[in-house]
């Protein structure tokens, strides 16, 4: 199954809003409707629909941190796979594609992500990509980061 990231547009935003999670997962992230609204008012957000062929399977949204004077840093703010398609490797492929898109910005040095500390599935998933926990933020979320070019850190 070939996974692609596509632009969010007039033709797919309604479907994205209604992508289902399992009930216990709904507390782990903001709704897709809220995320899409955010992306219309913050120019740094990049919302992407996750597809296999023509079937919508999920949603991911990341942004450059230019607005916080961290132009070389990106943050993944939303990431979800329709619960009917979880456990099939789709999320792994989609996150890899998002990381590759971010790497295309030659200035990008790091990617951050946050998740609830009580979500061990997220912790293990992101760690498998090389994300390292950096601590809990003021909202009680665990932050993790991956350095894209370790040579820039020296």
Sequence positions of predicted segments:
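Conserved glycine-rich acetyl-CoA-binding loop
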Residues: 69, 82-96, 117-124, 128
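Short coil/turn segments at alpha/beta junctions that flank glycine-rich nucleotide-binding fingerprints
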Residues: 88, 105-109
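C-terminal "cap" of GNAT-fold acetyltransferases
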Residues: 109-123, 127-154
């Amino acid at each position: 199954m070939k996974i692609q990231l596509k632009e969010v547009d007039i033709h797919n935003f309604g479907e994205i809003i209604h992508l289902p999670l399992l009930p216990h997962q709904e507390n782990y992230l903001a709704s897709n409707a809220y995320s899409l609204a955010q992306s219309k008012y913050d120019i740094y957000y990049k919302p992407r629909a996750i597809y296999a062929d023509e079937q919508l399977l999920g949603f991911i949204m990341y942004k450059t941190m230019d607005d916080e004077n961290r132009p070389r840093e990106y943050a993944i703010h939303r990431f979800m796979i329709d619960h009917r398609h979880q456990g099939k490797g789709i999320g792994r492929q989609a996150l890899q594609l998002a990381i590759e898109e971010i790497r295309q910005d030659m200035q990008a040095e790091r990617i951050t992500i946050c998740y609830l500390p009580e979500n061990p599935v997220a912790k293990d998933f992101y760690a498998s990509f090389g994300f390292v926990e950096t601590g809990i933020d003021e909202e009680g979320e665990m932050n993790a980061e991956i350095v894209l070019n370790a040579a820039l850190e020296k």
